[in-house]
From Swiss-Prot:
Lineage: Eukaryota, Metazoa, Chordata, Craniata, Vertebrata
InterPro entries found in the cross-reference section: Intracell_Traff_Signaling_Reg, PDZ, PDZ_sf
Protein name: Protein TAMALIN
Biased composition, class Pro residues, residue ranges: 296-305
PANTHER family per UniProt: GENERAL RECEPTOR FOR PHOSPHOINOSITIDES 1-ASSOCIATED SCAFFOLD PROTEIN-RELATED, PROTEIN TAMALIN
Compartments where located: Cytoplasm, Perinuclear region; Cell membrane; Postsynaptic cell membrane
Organism: Homo sapiens (Human)
Residues modified as Omega-N-methylarginine: 270
Keywords: Cell membrane, Cytoplasm, Membrane, Methylation, Phosphoprotein, Postsynaptic cell membrane, Synapse
UniProt modified residues of type Phosphothreonine: 77
């Protein structure tokens, strides 16, 4: 049963309970009476709906269990009265309702049976510390328990003396000097619970700070062992992890795309691979040789001392008889250095792409600009030219 059906049912009951004026006056048709406004269901039907006050008065006749069941089935709520919004009672604004006065009586050789503790509450808004004395423990079958004292009660006064703000030792002396009868005014609130939660929060913050320091230390050790890096800023670790994942996904890290087999493809020029040095000038070097099919008359220059590749460059064999003079061979050296001169790890994708394009040694290979005419001349004199790869390795 929904709230709308309850309204209709209430209107029908009111219509049945109200007597019809035409039935009481038989001669109403001959002598029409003056229209008298009477409250009833027709007036209620003329309006869009009954007001909230009338609806509350109508719903009071129903049993609460039936009304709650109908509201639970329909999923509706009761209409709100204007000007009477529901408000939670703030217990901190009415402390007088929580105050209670207890009288404790004991024998000469007996104790009151409760323990107190003084705690300082820090108010950040007011920049002050409030000292609160509360009951931390009540013994079983003691005069304090029989009087109704409970753990958590804040002591406001002792024997009519206000003890708020008094030191702990002075409160203890006042209680001991009271004799066998003690009159306590207590206040039960949430201040003690707040103090306990605040202390636990500070403990958790301290633990979090210590664990975070251990985590940063482990991250530094991991990066030092895996990558050989020593970074003081822990924020760089996220960048390193993202770059490494991107390089692995694109297949640009060593191992995912070997650079050596790419240089040894049949039908393409051979050359050196990456230089094996662990210093800051570690980079990628590659040399391409171009020559004619005719055997050369002079042997090629010796390979450079600092270049480590998969093997020496292939040169055509010298024929047994004299032949025409062979064309001069050209060599080009390309240096692809990573940012920062890092040696062990992978280089960025742009540099590896440039190295692969240079490894293909296409016809449109751009010549390197030399700094002097002497170097350009020595390049075309076999036997006199120095290794360009060795010169580039010093940069």
């Amino acid at each position: 049963m929904t709230l709308r059906r309850l309204r209709k049912l209430q209107q029908k009951e009111e219509a049945a309970a109200t007597p019809d004026p035409a039935a009481r006056t038989p001669d109403s048709e001959v002598a029409p009476a003056a229209p008298v406004p009477t409250p009833g269901p027709p007036a209620a039907a003329a309006t869009p709906g009954p007001p909230a006050d009338e609806l509350y008065a109508a719903l009071e006749d129903y049993h609460p269990a039936e009304l709650y069941r109908a509201l639970a089935v329909s999923g509706g709520t009761l209409p709100r009265r204007k000007g009477s919004g529901f408000r939670w009672k703030n217990l901190s604004q009415s402390p007088e309702q929580q105050r209670k006065v207890l009288t404790l009586e004991k024998e000469d050789n007996q104790t009151f049976g409760f323990e107190i503790q003084t705690y300082g509450l820090h108010h950040r808004e007011e920049q002050r510390v409030e000292m609160v004395t509360f009951v931390c423990r009540v013994h079983e079958s003691s005069p304090a328990q029989l009087a109704g004292l409970t753990p958590g009660d804040t002591i406001a006064s002792v024997n009519g003396l206000n003890v708020e703000g008094i030191r702990h030792r002075e409160i203890v002396d006042i209680i001991k000097a009271s004799g066998n009868v003690l009159r306590l005014e207590t206040l039960y609130g949430t201040s003690i619970r707040k103090a306990e939660l605040e202390a636990r929060l500070q403990y958790l913050k301290q633990t979090l700070y210590e664990k975070w320091g251990e985590y940063r230390s482990l991250m530094v050790q991991e990066q030092r062992l895996v990558h050989g890096l020593v970074v003081k800023d822990p924020s760089i670790y996220d960048t390193l992890e993202s770059v490494r994942s991107c390089l692995y996904g694109a297949g640009l890290l060593p191992g995912s795309l070997p650079f050596g087999p790419l240089l040894a493809v049949p039908g393409r020029p051979r050359g050196g691979a990456r230089r094996a040095r662990g210093d800051a000038d570690d980079a990628v070097y590659h040399t391409c040789f171009f020559g004619d099919s005719e055997p050369p008359a002079l042997p090629p220059p010796p390979p450079p001392a600092r270049a480590f590749g998969p093997g020496p460059a292939e040169t055509p064999a010298v024929g047994p008889g004299p032949g025409p003079r062979a064309a001069l061979s050209r060599s080009a050296s390309v240096r692809c250095a990573g940012p920062g001169g890092g040696g062990g790890g992978g280089a960025p994708g742009a540099l590896w792409t440039e190295a692969r394009e240079q490894a293909l040694c296409g016809p449109g290979l751009r010549k390197t600009k030399y700094r002097s005419f002497r170097r350009r001349l020595l390049k075309f004199i076999p036997g006199l030219n120095r290794s360009l790869e060795e010169e580039e390795s010093q940069l």
